[in-house]
């Protein structure tokens, strides 16, 4: 069957971004591909990234993601970022997945053949050991020959005020200084762009930045490219006459004869319903408004005067004149939520 909506993943853009971020950080990359590679397709992106010389390994959030990637045998280290259930440890270790550890109890439960990365909570108050406790955990892992790396996560590195991120870095260094030399990583995308090379770090973990999206105040640092372009087909064309309304709630009313294209993308596909009244698409070479409420499976677009046919494509966001940042703003949300919310009915393909 023909896809009704497609997310085109640019291998060239991803390759460019990975090279630029590795150069900026001065390290190799541990690329997060969690949440279906931020909506881009975990297996697809995993294969592309594994072929890049600047990528040391891949990082995921759940044991299920880890198992899926490990079975692809991509030839790169794979780090699970969040603690698995105790009964999952053996299977993950058998697959070669690097495991996160932050307590002495987790050290004791770790299979003897597993490698671990010590997670340090330097201020995020999410996961990890506080610095005062982390050293003992790290030393216990090192004594067992299982400490491959140490990591933390910045809470504010993508903000203009970097004072708290610098405090976190000081706390992280206090742990590193008390442990034998191992892989160390702390910089997310904001950290890479804000700080550049951080002395003593072995890896960087740029998430959304690797896919081409960064806060506006950091865009001048690296010329990153959006990796994803989303397009959906025109399913039907008709005319709305003066006085007629379009979509649920009858919110939009035609003041003139209006060409209407029904485009196969809706909130069930991840397009934010909150963008109603503000959203637009690129179609027939122009930016045109979405009419009325966005529906579950489709949206209606004003194509008056355009040469558009059934089966033509409308661009929802991409590298051109309409970005996912626009869509997120219209939907009162953030790029992360739009991208990771992209539905399974949208086919991911390279090109």
Curated annotation (Swiss-Prot):
Q: Which residues are named in the active-site annotation? A: 34, 248
Q: Name one Pfam family in it.
A: Ala_racemase_C
> SMART domains this protein is in?
Ala_racemase_C
The cross-references to Gene3D superfamilies, in alphabetical order and at most eight, read: Alanine racemase (3.20.20.10), Lyase, Ornithine Decarboxylase, Chain A, domain 1 (2.40.37.10)
Question: Per the record, GO CC terms?
Answer: cytosol
Modified residue N6-(pyridoxal phosphate)lysine is at which positions?
34
Catalysis performed (reactions): L-alanine = D-alanine
Report the function annotation for this chain: Catalyzes the interconversion of L-alanine and D-alanine. May also act on other amino acids.
Record protein name field? Alanine racemase
Lineage summary: Bacteria, Thermotogati, Deinococcota, Deinococci, Deinococcales
Encoding gene (name): alr
């Amino acid at each position: 069957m023909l896809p009704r909506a497609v997310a085109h993943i640019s291998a060239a853009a991803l390759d460019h971004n990975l090279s630029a971020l590795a150069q900026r950080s001065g390290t190799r990359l541990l690329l997060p591909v969690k949440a279906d590679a931020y909506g881009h397709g975990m297996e697809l992106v995993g294969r592309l990234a594994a072929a890049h010389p600047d990528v040391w390994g891949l990082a995921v959030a759940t044991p299920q993601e880890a198992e899926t990637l490990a079975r692809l045998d991509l030839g790169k280290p794979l780090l699970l970022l969040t603690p698995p259930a105790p009964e999952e440890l053996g299977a993950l270790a058998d697959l070669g997945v690097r495991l996160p550890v932050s307590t002495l109890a987790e050290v004791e439960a770790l299979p003897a053949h597993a490698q671990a990365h010590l997670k340090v909570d330097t201020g995020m108050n999410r996961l990890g050991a506080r610095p005062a406790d982390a050293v003992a955990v790290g030393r216990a892992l090192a004594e067992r020959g299982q400490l491959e790396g140490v990591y933390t996560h910045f809470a504010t590195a993508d903000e203009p005020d970097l004072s708290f991120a610098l405090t976190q870095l000081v706390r992280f260094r206090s742990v590193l200084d008390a442990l034998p030399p191992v892989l160390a990583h702390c910089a997310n995308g904001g950290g890479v762009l804000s700080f550049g090379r951080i002395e003593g770090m072995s890896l960087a973990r740029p998430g959304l930045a690797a896919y081409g999206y960064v806060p506006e105040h950091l865009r001048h640092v690296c010329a990153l490219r959006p990796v994803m372009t989303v397009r959906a087909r025109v399913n039907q064309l008709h005319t709305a006459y003066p006085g007629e309304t379009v979509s649920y709630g009858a919110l939009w009313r035609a003041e003139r004869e209006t060409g209407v294209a029904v485009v196969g993308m809706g909130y069930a596909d991840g397009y934010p319903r909150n963008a109603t009244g503000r959203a637009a698409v690129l179609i027939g070479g122009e930016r045109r408004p979405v009419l009325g409420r966005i529906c579950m499976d489709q949206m209606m677009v004003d194509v008056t005067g355009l040469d558009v046919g059934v089966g033509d494509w409308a661009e929802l966001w991409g590298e051109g004149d309409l970005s996912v940042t626009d869509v997120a703003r219209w939907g009162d949300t953030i790029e992360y939520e739009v991208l990771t919310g992209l539905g399974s009915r949208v086919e991911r393909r390279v090109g």
